[in-house]
């Protein structure tokens, strides 16, 4: 199961006493700020969580799996996420506890 934006907003409502509307808006604004930073080419660093980076990928050869035809995969920019040490440690501890 995945954590959704709606569940994040519900947690803000339950744990911090935000109104449901304010909780939803807070979650939307948070993600919009991350989007804007990435769109303008900035790295996003969330201390204790991880970093969102932009990476340019070069054009490379590919193959159509149905026909076997060689086709070029165009150059593109992708978003990558590198978890921070604290997040890695917590996830590793979860595996050890289970």
Swiss-Prot record:
CDD domains registered for this protein in UniProt: IHF_A
Map out region (Disordered) in residue numbers. Answer: 51-71
Q: Which GO terms describe its cellular component?
A: cytosol
Q: Which Pfam families match?
A: Bac_DNA_binding
Basic and acidic residues biased stretches:
53-69
- SMART domains, per this entry? BHL
| Gene Ontology terms: biological process | DNA recombination; positive regulation of bioluminescence; regulation of DNA-templated transcription; regulation of translation
Q: What does this protein do?
A: This protein is one of the two subunits of integration host factor, a specific DNA-binding protein that functions in genetic recombination as well as in transcriptional and translational control.
Q: Which HAMAP family match?
A: IHF_alpha
Q: What does the sequence similarity comment in the record state about its family?
A: Belongs to the bacterial histone-like protein family.
Annotated protein name in UniProt: Integration host factor subunit alpha
Gene symbol of the encoding locus: ihfA
